[in-house]
Amino acid sequence: MDNEYDLETLAVRAGSVRSQFNEHSEAMFLTSSFVFGSAAEAAARFKGEQPGPIYARFTNPTVQMMEARLAALEGAERCVAFASGMAAILATVMGLMKAGEHVVASRSIFGSTVQLFSNILGRFGIETTYVSPTDPAEWRAAVKPNTKLFFVESPSNPLTEVSDLRALAAIAHEAGAWLAVDNCFCSPALQRPLELGADIVIHSATKYLDGQGRVLGGAVLGSQALMEGVYTFLRTAGPTLSAFNAWVILKGMETLSLRMDAHSRNALALAQWLETQPAVARVLYPGLPSHPQHALAMTQQKTGGGIVAFELKGGKDAAWKLIDATKMLSITANLGDTKSTITHPATTTHGRLAPEQRARSVWMSATDSSPTEIGRAHV
């Protein structure tokens, strides 16, 4: 579908392919394999001489529709879908790098991503150096002759730190490396990293792309050349997105723009309200003028997003007390749901990290009733 259409139209129409039955809603192909018309056709498919599905570990028509839609939303040449966001990150490294090479990564990233880089990839000879997400000079200083990848979340999980993606892209390319951006906190409705110079965009489709906390999924996007290596890892190792999950994500993307507008509006209102509360030590939300990278965020993002981080003056005990006192907020580590969620990252998603790496904030996604609910919990 021509990308001259607006994002709202692409979210509904891009990637749709009808079967011979001309269904209006995209079809879900629940099958492990596909039948060939002849031995010659089977051979041609496996050699890559003829297009068409072969085996569901390789791909599936429903998955392909989901990939095409997300590629249109991100402005990417190609998307490769995975069973989870973490599988997508692993595939990016394993598909494009080899032992003896080096990653420069933001030190403010998801806890499982730190575990992956430090404890798993390190065993296979891929070294990682962690640097400040907000200081491009640290990224430049960390570059080695064998550096192949820069990895960053912007905004970061959970402190919503915003990185200068244009600056990081320039430093990475000067070093002969790629810049990969985890765009989970924004989605393409709010930020398109490829337009800012990134080479690779990564998603946990579990979050805003699904939008209702129903299924797991992941995706890696970029040029055809880069994605060929990522796809080779998928085809060989098999962290494949199921047709059912792809269909759910495909339908979830139809309302992405509407949901992100509402998430952003509600999060801003919550952040503004939290700034007035005496028990709150600080509020971290990119849409607030008080956020350290507010000006930068507004040059990269459409809005501040749907996630608000805040610290209470009473520390962990106060945070737990608040969380336990809420009634209409779900205590869960997921984000991007239509239901408001709340968690304490230092003792959940980032609990296995060293103490100096843990965020002290409470972390929330918001609905329009969130200030009332937090108020009832006696912040």
Where are these regions (language model features)?
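Conserved PLP-enzyme active-site core in the AAT-like
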Residues: 2, 11-17, 78-279, 284
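Conserved small/polar residues in nucleotide/adenosyl-binding loops
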Residues: 377-379
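Conserved C-terminal alpha-helix-loop-beta "cap" of PLP-dependent enzymes
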Residues: 282-369
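N-terminal "arm"/small-domain region of PLP-dependent enzymes with the aminotransferase-like
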Residues: 2-60, 365-370
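Conserved N-terminal alpha-helix of the aminotransferase class I/II PLP-enzyme fold
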Residues: 38-87, 112-119
